[in-house]
Amino acid sequence: MQLIATLSALGALVATATAAAVPSAPVKQSVIDIQLSATGNTMIKATITNKGDQALNLLQFNTILDKNPTRKVRVYQNGTEVKFTGMLARYKMTGLSPDYFTTLSPKASVESSFDIARTHDLTRGGKITVMASGTIPTAEGHGANGTTITGYAKYESNKIELDVDAKKAASVVQAMGTVKKSPGSIDKRTNIDTSTCTQSQLDALEGALYNSAALAQAAAQAAPSNLDTVAEYFKSTSRRTINTIVSRLQSVASESTYVNSGSTTYYCTDVMNGCQPGVLAYTLPDQNIITNCPIYYSDLPALAQSCHEQDQATTTLHEMTHNSAVVSPYCDDLGYGYEDATSLSAGQAIQNADTYALFANVS
């Protein structure tokens, strides 16, 4: 497999590199059990149990164990999903620290509690339904020897019903709040807030946007004729799937390009305290805001030299798909990395941010 980063959309060069072999990481269907219970007006307790006969190291990133205000559960009211106000983060998936994992012995359980009013708009009150589903990356071993992802554990929790007191829910402080945009400091490159940038950060971000636009445009052009690759990543080659892929990638390319003023605001540095350990960048989808974190600049190459490797360009592309002004409905984090993303169903893959980044990386 080759990585072909085609920059012809913006009149640049073509970079080609040989891909490294992708290790097998099987999806374990029912190794863990998750039970939800209500412990207050909007407080939820999740009990995670290892049903298997081997110890598990469960990666916390973008799962129900995540300590950051990411999407841990789905909340519905009258059949419609309640607005999510938290952050959608892209994490660095190499060099993982043991601190990022929760270890569960066979048949053991761990509890995680969180207030869904901190990451959802529940100010209307009334009856809601809460559930959780997804996959948790797993590693074998303990400590520093147990940080290499070797599999993925699928889960689907029970559903619980809550009758939310609107006044109490409104009194809960939102985890991410509202960002105050700086007037007079906007660069017409997807509205970069230059007041948050050093020159080196601005140069890196502009380069990432340039490459994001080129990769997205090249992938959009390739999708209708590269059906085997579309099927590999999106699990469908229907006309509707192809049209959705092309439309969304073209939208990302347009938003990333130099000549657009853009609908998103991009910050070079953290403005909402979302840059916790392991976070490369994050998006506030309800505000159409993207923020880069320090390790975006220090730990990522501008463009990857192998397939499925994280870089600045595809991280920016990934984050673009989280914004409702770019992709509607915006994409979520349903599967992370090649093995996890390609285990999704067609319906999930088309809504998964990393699927677009991975597809663009190899198109």
Swiss-Prot record:
Gene Ontology CC: one annotated term: extracellular region
Reaction(s) the record says it catalyses: Preferential cleavage of bonds with hydrophobic residues in P1'. Also 3-Asn-|-Gln-4 and 8-Gly-|-Ser-9 bonds in insulin B chain
EC number: 3.4.24.39
PROSITE patterns: ZINC_PROTEASE
InterPro entries assigned: Fungal_M35_metalloproteases, MetalloPept_cat_dom_sf, Peptidase_M35
Location of this chain's protein in the cell: Secreted
Cofactor note: Binds 1 zinc ion per subunit.
Cofactor section: Zn(2+)
Signal peptide residues on this chain, from the entry's feature table: 1-19
Keyword Secreted appears in the UniProt entry: yes
Disulfide bonding pattern of the chain: C197-C268, C275-C293
Active site per the UniProt annotation: E319
EC class: hydrolase
GO molecular function, one term: metal ion binding
PANTHER family: NEUTRAL PROTEASE 2, PTHR37016
Family named by the database record: Belongs to the peptidase M35 family.
Role according to the record: Probable secreted metalloprotease that shows high activities on basic nuclear substrates such as histone and protamine. May be involved in virulence.
Name of the protein described by the UniProt record: Probable neutral protease 2 homolog MCYG_01991
